């Protein structure tokens, strides 16, 4: 296997960390998505065989990890610990160089992976253990190993405390994180970005749109209903002396307003179901959908990825497009994901891949696409960066163009889209501070001012 120069640098750095006599043996591999972190890790495993290696990953990429190890180091024996018929014998782990295991198995009552001492533990997409109160975090902390690696492009997934949790897994305490962040960054974190390597540039653009009058009318209705409901809930919460008792209900109201901005039919269907009424079809226009379709039509010689929040909007887009369309959403099996990916990569240049953000942010290598559309902004900038990284990665031959479609609001009815983008900026600032990567502040363009979660809740002036 021939590595790129930045990958050789990464492998050498990791081997130095594993042989270090000072501090924890391991650290953070935080390369930006798409720079080949897996290839670097497999090379380290191959060059420093020191007992069995445990690789813990999201369930959706267990098979991909197994395949990548076979591809990059066929001499390594790989054992997949997953499925109904998985082994109950911990000694099986010691008979293989690498064991790949999903995070879900860490939460068993007596996890089998706790029964042996591993040479190395790798947590891929390590933000999965960011909650220190979760069973996943507590179980991961109990895994015994000589070397410990955290692998993620987003060590600050929601807040800086996420990073504190990941440091704890490595063996770095909270006080050290608070007092010695710069030292930790220099010694224990390696991060390279695509701008510094031979990957074509990625262009980001927020496309701000005015809603059509009929959309504005529906949004005003949804906003006003949410505002009234939230005000009433806040009064009840205050009377009970419990300010958080209606948090989920408040978020549901926020979601309804958001649905109008994604695709109005979602809101109409949701209200009909709630009121047990007959569903009516949305007959109005959608500026966001029209802009999406027009933009796709302007680039018939490039493959396109469309990232959506809701399956309902995916259904509409799939119905309207006349080009070849492929799809991954939260209901897709592992086999379906793999077949859709393979078919898209073989498909004509005008093909479109519809991907639900929560289902397609990990484990997909789609360098054949060079146009990306995000129909609704995500709460977390890291989620969007992961999605974009599916095509803007090592092996990409074209420049990648990313467009995020955002509806504008007004003083009376503020835009949910704009509020989420503002929140992204706040989180991007935290990313930049922890990773020492100023580029992250502008990688996902947003408004100039940030917005806290409490301010998001107050968007309805309730």
Task: Label each PLM-derived region with a short phrase.
Residues 100-105, 111-115, 135-145, 168-270, ...:
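Inter-lobe coupling linker of SF2 helicases/translocases
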Residues 22-26, 32-33, 40, 47, ...:
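Conserved Helicase C-terminal RecA-like lobe
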Residues 108-110, 159-160, 314-316, 352-370, ...:
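SF2 helicase motor core recognition
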Residues 48, 113-118, 141-146, 366-368, ...:
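Short, conserved loop/helix-junction motifs that constitute active-site signature segments
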Residues 1, 5, 12-25, 38-40, ...:
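SF2 helicase/translocase NTPase motor core
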Residues 379-388, 392-462:
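A conserved SF2-helicase RecA2
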């Amino acid at each position: 296997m021939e590595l790129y120069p930045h990958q050789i640098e990464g492998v050498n750095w990791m081997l130095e960390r594993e042989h270090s006599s000072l501090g924890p043996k391991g650290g953070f591999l935080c390369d930006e998505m798409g720079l080949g972190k897996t290839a670097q890790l497999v090379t380290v495993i191959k060059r420093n065989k020191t007992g069995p290696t445990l690789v813990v990953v999201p369930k959706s990429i267990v098979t991909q990890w197994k395949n990548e190890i076979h591809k990059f180091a066929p001499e390594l024996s790989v054992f997949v610990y997953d499925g109904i018929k998985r082994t109950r014998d911990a000694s099986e782990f010691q008979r293989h160089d690498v064991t790949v295991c999903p995070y879900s198995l860490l939460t068993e009552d007596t996890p089998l992976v706790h029964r042996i001492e591993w040479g190395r533990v790798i947590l891929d997409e390590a933000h999965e253990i960011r909650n220190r109160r979760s069973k996943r975090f507590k179980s991961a902390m109990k895994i015994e190993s000589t070397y410990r690696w955290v692998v993620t492009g987003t060590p600050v997934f929601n807040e800086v405390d996420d990073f504190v949790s990941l440091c704890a897994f490595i063996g770095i305490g909270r006080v050290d994180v608070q007092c010695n962040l710069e030292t930790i960054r220099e010694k224990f974190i390696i991060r390279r970005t695509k701008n510094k390597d031979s990957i074509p540039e990625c262009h980001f653009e927020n496309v701000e749109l005015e809603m059509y009058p009929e959309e504005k009318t529906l949004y005003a209705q949804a906003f006003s209903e949410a505002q009234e409901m939230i005000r009433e809930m806040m009064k009840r919460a205050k009377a009970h002396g419990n300010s958080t008792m209606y948090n989920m209900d408040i978020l549901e109201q926020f979601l309804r307003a958001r649905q109008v901005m994604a695709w109005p039919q979602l809101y109409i269907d949701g209200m009909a179901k709630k009121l047990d009424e007959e569903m009516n079809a949305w007959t109005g226009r959608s500026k966001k959908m029209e802009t999406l379709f027009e933009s796709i039509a302007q680039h018939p010689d490039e493959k396109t990825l469309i990232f959506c929040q809701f399956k309902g909007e995916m259904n509409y887009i799939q119905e309207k497009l006349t080009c070849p369309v492929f799809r991954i959403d939260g209901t897709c099996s592992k086999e379906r994901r793999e077949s859709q990916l393979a078919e898209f990569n073989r498909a004509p240049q005008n093909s479109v891949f519809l991907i639900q953000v929560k289902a397609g942010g990990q484990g997909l290598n789609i360098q054949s696409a060079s146009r990306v559309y995000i129909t609704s902004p995500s709460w977390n900038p890291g989620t969007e960066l992961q999605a974009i990284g599916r095509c803007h990665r090592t092996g990409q031959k074209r420049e990648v163009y990313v467009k995020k479609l955002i509806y504008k609001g007004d003083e009376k009815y503020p835009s949910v889209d704009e509020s989420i983008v503002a929140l992204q900026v706040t989180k991007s600032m935290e990313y930049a501070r922890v990773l020492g990567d100023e580029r992250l502040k502008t990688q996902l363009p947003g408004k100039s001012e940030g917005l806290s979660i409490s301010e998001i809740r107050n968007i309805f002036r309730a």
